[in-house]
A protein has these predicted regions:
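Short amphipathic, positively biased membrane-proximal segments
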Residues: 1-133
Length: 133
């Protein structure tokens, strides 16, 4: 029987790469925490967001900041470029990114027609998928 701690460790290893060092993990988690705490305070507009959108912004920032660090570790590069990884694996990984949609939700009150914002979200997502292919 696998413990919850063991399952969590396995999931983390499959996310950032099983060769991640303590420094890699600390930097990744630290950057994510910094994004969660610091990023929303970098612009006055973020302070005026409704609570739900502020939480969404914090989660998005934590994911982006932590992800940038994780993706730039040797462990992550080796894991995602290991033997057996196919273009389909990379496309599925990219498809799971919901950032373009979340940005469109956060931008919904920005000036401009809603259709243009929807088109922009689709264009960003399409670019992400094309860049991955």
């Amino acid at each position: 029987m696998t413990s919850d701690r063991s399952r969590l460790r396995t999931a983390w290893d499959e996310f950032v790469g099983p060769e991640a060092t303590a420094v890699d993990n600390s930097l990744t988690l630290g950057a994510g925490l910094a994004g969660l705490v610091v990023a929303p305070s970098l612009t006055p507009a973020a302070r005026a967001l409704p609570r739900g959108e502020a939480v969404l912004l914090r989660i998005l920032a934590a994911d982006l900041w932590g992800g940038v660090v994780a993706n730039n570790t040797r462990a992550c590069a080796r894991w995602y470029e290991r033997s057996g990884q196919t273009d389909a694996h990379h496309l599925r990984f990219a498809a799971a990114h919901l950032h373009p949609l979340l940005v469109a939700v956060l931008d919904r009150r920005a000036p401009g027609a809603p259709v243009r914002r929807g088109v922009a979200a689709v264009a960003r997502y399409g670019y992400l998928m094309l860049a991955t292919a």
